[in-house]
Swiss-Prot record:
It is found in: Nucleus. It is an enzyme of class 2 (transferase). GO terms for biological process: heterochromatin formation; methylation. Polycomb group (PcG) protein. Catalytic subunit of some PcG multiprotein complex, which methylates 'Lys-27' of histone H3, leading to transcriptional repression of the affected target genes. PcG proteins are not required to initiate repression, but to maintain it during later stages of development. This is Histone-lysine N-methyltransferase EZ3. Residues 1-13 have a biased composition (Low complexity). Belongs to the class V-like SAM-binding methyltransferase superfamily. Histone-lysine methyltransferase family. EZ subfamily. It comes from Zea mays. It catalyses: L-lysyl(27)-[histone H3] + 3 S-adenosyl-L-methionine = N(6),N(6),N(6)-trimethyl-L-lysyl(27)-[histone H3] + 3 S-adenosyl-L-homocysteine + 3 H(+). Residues 628-732 form the CXC domain. Residues 528-578 form the SANT domain. The keyword S-adenosyl-L-methionine applies. Keywords: Methyltransferase, Nucleus, Repressor, S-adenosyl-L-methionine, Transcription, Transcription regulation, Transferase. Widely expressed.
């Protein structure tokens, strides 16, 4: 209420000041009506506001009156009740009764006045106290003092949060530009720590909070005149706010109005399906970290730059013969039966002669067959024979329901026969609903023509099955849902002649009828393919990248509830295969399907996983230091002569040039970069044999890196029993020893009182030399931030800062692990080392020598000669003091 009146007063004063200005230019003609409308709207808002205030005051007055009357009635009733009693002050009466009861109790027990006498002069040395009482029962009590042993105070302990991995500092935790308060242990007072008054920033401008009336003003103005610069400038004259704040507020009001509009869930679902996958996954791209594989990553932050690698991870290829149907609507139930049925008697068939797109067919539905639910007596079967260009047949049998219309006595003649195609060039395929694939060819040629057979049969089968695909999901819920129909309704009207054993007869009239049927089938095919939304198509293409041409996995993982496996397979072999081709192939959707299928088969056979490559015969490669691909700057950094360089993935395509950020910073391109594997700046890992990754011969270890299972050849991790396709565990139980930080294989660390200073870290079990003990974790802060925090830590005689690289410093004061309590020593038993693990610099603590159990851990902080605390300074005359490097603050440095 007060804020609205204040805002209205400020807006009126602002408008008055603007009107009183001299030499002001005339307002444009388009601004005059906006100004007038807003002025009238402000008057209406003020009048409604005044009316609302009056009503609110009246309601509050009535409420206060009722409340006061009720309190007055309660007080009056209490006064009447007190007058009706014996009278007197109740409080004084109760006090007197209490004193009387206490005195009576003492007299009843015979206890008089007790006198306590302290015999300080006589019994001070012996440490005794004598208590005596006078009265009827005089008593004397001697109390002997017990001197307690001196117990040292517990060292100061700062509350901290455990971190299993490093994380960046929150924006509101920065101390730069703020006055820091610390407590002086000597004077026991709070002091302000600040270098100078110049560090104190200017007070920030208060953010404007919009009132309800201002929201109405902004909403009406934007709805009537739109949101442009002129409207915003006019609104600034009535609202004491900046143009950017007004624009942000208008967007908030627009979103709020959209939510309150009450759009149905069905419309929202349809709108989400019409969006592309990039639009739907906008929040996913901002929140998901592709380096840590977690949401809301605290190490790399949100809204990272998306880096799309040019080379995708290969997927495993599995032939259809080894697959199992994923459900009732799986395409393998139709495609998996490419064989000739020798044990089923055929009394009718449908023959399709294929040449230049012409089709001839013949149908008979009087064949009895087994149904999928083991009812051999029920259900009819429809079979068809597809005659190809090399003489083989395709027979597809589908059981129909018992209520199907009885077959007509007439069957159609073959509408179209190939007159100029010799019989020897015809090829026949046979498709059965079940059973392994079989070819009527010699075993030597079977594997050679596998691709073309699959593409040819799938193309024909999908065209025939298109009219029934739309209702497959509904039929699968019914008891007879697995009894699908493949043939078109036009096949019910075929003639009654059975020409299964006769020669085909062609007429011009039937050819025209059949061409219309084929054209209608093609039109329905195009309509079905167009039913795929933009989101479904994008999910399909993403499934091709992840799972390859496996419709079972695509439908199950990406299109669950939207498309069935049969629909995905049909889309794949008609339209999706051409869409999923890489841009380098540059094929159209209407291209040769067999060629498209052949290209994909070749890609599948070449792009195999690391599992398949390792099972094969390993090649003997010549190993050189250059194969590691790390620049010489890494070696200098490994010697501790300069800081490590922060790694940021590059977005280069194919090969990196001189303008690559990684090349400019002197870092290697990692697996997270967008460049290809053949990039000269790419780190290629190591090819070390057994037990060589912990020596200087390993390129990863020499460059202060940990081995990466995705990059290094022989440094891989196995887990499980191999049922999920992972590589089997090695018989000797060998595991790379340069992946301790990555796998978090740290030792057990205990926390206790240190004999040196404060708290200390102790090892629970004995360890050997160079064994990995644990990771030094904390907040990632900038060097400027570390300088400000270090001044406070120096006054508290503690140091939790650790130099990491040229951009970040680790601070374990508030967040970290137990190794933050490891003290400094000039003769340490541990050492710290910065390692590059999966593109991130991390600090590992390693044993410098053999350490027994329960022994305290020490490592050299590398203090400067003038910055080490008193307990951490070396004895006088030490030669190593001259070689130590002076730093700006007391901090820890890895070697």
């Amino acid at each position: 209420m007060a804020s609205s009146s204040k805002a209205s007063d400020s807006s009126s004063q602002r408008s008055k000041r603007s009107d009183q200005g001299t030499g002001r230019e005339a307002a444009p003609a388009s601004v005059v009506p906006i100004h007038g409308n807003l002025t009238q709207l402000i008057r209406q808002i003020k009048s409604r506001r005044l009316l609302y205030i009056k009503e609110k005051l009246e309601a509050n007055r009535k409420t206060l009156q009722r409340h006061s009357c009720s309190l007055f009635d309660v007080a009056a009733a209490a006064e009447v009740a007190s007058r009706g009693s014996d009278g007197g002050n109740a409080l004084s009466q109760r006090a007197a009764e209490g004193q009387f009861r206490l005195a009576g109790s003492d007299l009843a027990h015979g206890i008089g006045e007790r006198d306590v006498v302290y015999m300080q002069e006589e019994n001070l040395a012996s440490g005794t106290l004598v208590l005596s009482s006078s009265g009827a029962a005089a008593q004397r009590t001697v109390v002997r003092f017990v001197k307690l042993p001196l117990v040292e105070r517990i060292p100061p302990y700062t509350t901290w949060i455990f971190l299993d991995k490093n994380q960046r500092m929150a924006d509101d935790q920065s101390v730069v530009g703020r006055r820091r308060i610390y407590y002086d242990p000597v004077g026991n007072e709070a002091l302000i720590c600040s270098d100078s008054d110049e560090e104190i920033p200017e007070p920030e401008e208060e953010k404007h909070f919009f009132t309800e009336g201002e929201d109405q003003l902004i909403w009406r103005a934007t709805q009537e005149h739109g949101l442009n610069r002129e409207v915003v400038n006019v609104l600034c004259q009535f609202i004491d706010s900046t143009p950017s704040e007004i624009e942000e507020r208008s967007e908030v009001l627009f979103e709020k109005n959209e939510k309150n509009s009450g759009s149905s869930d069905k419309i929202e679902r349809q709108l989400s399906l019409d969006k592309t996958m990039d639009a739907v996954l906008d929040s996913f791209d901002n929140l998901f970290c592709r380096r840590c594989l977690v949401f809301d990553c605290r190490l790399h932050g949100c809204s990272q730059n998306l880096v799309f690698p040019t080379e995708k991870q290969p997927y495993s290829f599995e032939p259809d013969e080894n697959k199992k149907p994923c459900g009732r609507q799986c395409y393998l139930r139709w495609r998996g039966g490419f064989q000739e049925i020798h044990d089923v008697g055929l009394s009718g068939c449908a023959t399709y002669n294929m040449e230049s797109g012409t089709v001839s067919h013949k149908v008979d539905v009087s064949i009895m067959s087994e149904s999928e639910d083991s009812n051999r007596e029920k259900g009819n079967i429809r079979s068809m024979t597809l005659v190809g260009t090399s003489g083989s047949k395709i027979i597809s049998s589908v059981s129909a329901e018992e209520s199907t219309t009885p077959p007509s006595a007439d069957t159609s003649e073959t509408e179209n026969a190939s007159s100029d195609m010799p019989p020897s060039s015809l090829r026949k395929y046979k498709i059965s609903k079940r059973g392994p694939r079989y070819r009527e060819r010699s075993p030597g040629k079977r594997q050679k023509v596998f691709t073309s057979d699959i593409s040819f049969a799938s193309n024909i089968l999908n065209k025939l099955s298109i009219p029934e695909i739309r209702d497959t999901r509904l039929e699968s819920r019914e008891p007879g849902g697995d009894k699908l129909q493949i043939l078109d309704e036009s096949t019910k009207k075929t003639s009654s002649k059975d020409i299964c054993g006769e020669s085909p007869i062609t007429t011009t009239e039937n050819m025209g009828i059949e061409s219309k049927k084929v054209s209608s089938t093609k039109n329905f095919l195009e309509h079905t393919l167009s039913c795929w939304s933009a989101l479904e198509r994008d999910l399909y293409l993403k499934g091709i990248e992840i799972f390859g041409k496996n419709s079972c996995l695509i439908a199950r993982n990406l299109l669950s509830g939207m498309k069935t496996c049969m629909e995905v397979a049909n889309y794949m072999y008609n339209n999706g295969a051409a869409m999923a081709k890489r841009p380098l192939l540059n094929k159209s959707i209407s291209g040769d399907f067999a060629e498209t299928e052949q290209d994909y088969m070749e890609q599948d056979m070449v792009a195999r996983t690391r599992i398949y490559r390792r099972r094969g015969r390993n090649r003997k490669l010549k190993y050189t230091w250059k194969s590691a691909g790390h620049p010489t700057v890494r070696k200098r950094i490994g010697d501790g002569k300069q800081w490590y360089t922060q790694y940021n993935p590059c977005v280069c395509q194919q090969m990196c040039g001189k303008d690559c950020p990684c090349v400019e910073n002197g870092t290697c391109c990692e697996k997270y970069c967008g460049c290809s594997k053949s990039c000269k700046n790419k780190f290629r890992g190591c090819h070390c044999a057994k037990s060589q990754c912990r020596s200087r011969q390993c390129p990863c270890f020499a460059a202060s890196r940990e081995c990466d299972p995705d990059v290094c050849r022989n440094c891989w991790v196995s887990c499980g029993d191999g049922s999920l396709g992972e590589p089997p565990a090695r018989g000797d139980g060998y595991q790379c020893g340069n992946m301790k930080l990555l796998l978090k294989q740290q030792q057990r660390i205990l926390l206790g009182r240190s004999d040196v200073a404060g708290w200390g870290a102790f090892i629970k079990n004995p360890v050997n030399k160079n064994d990995y003990l644990g990771e030094y974790t904390g907040e990632l802060i900038s060097h400027k931030e570390a300088d400000k925090r270090g001044k406070i830590y120096d006054r508290a005689n503690s140091s939790f800062l650790f130099d990491l690289n040229d951009q970040y410093v680790l601070d374990a004061y508030r967040k970290g692990d137990k190794l933050k309590f490891a003290n400094h020593s000039s003769n340490p038993n541990c050492y710290a080392k910065v390692m590059l693990v999966a593109g991130d610099h991390r600090v590992g603590i390693y044993a410098k020598e053999h350490i027994e159990a329960s022994e305290e851990l020490f490592y050299d902080y590398r203090y400067g000669p003038d910055q080490a605390p008193a307990w951490a300074r070396r004895p006088e005359g030490s030669k190593k003091d001259e070689a130590s490097v002076s730093h700006h603050r007391a901090h820890k440095v890895a070697r």
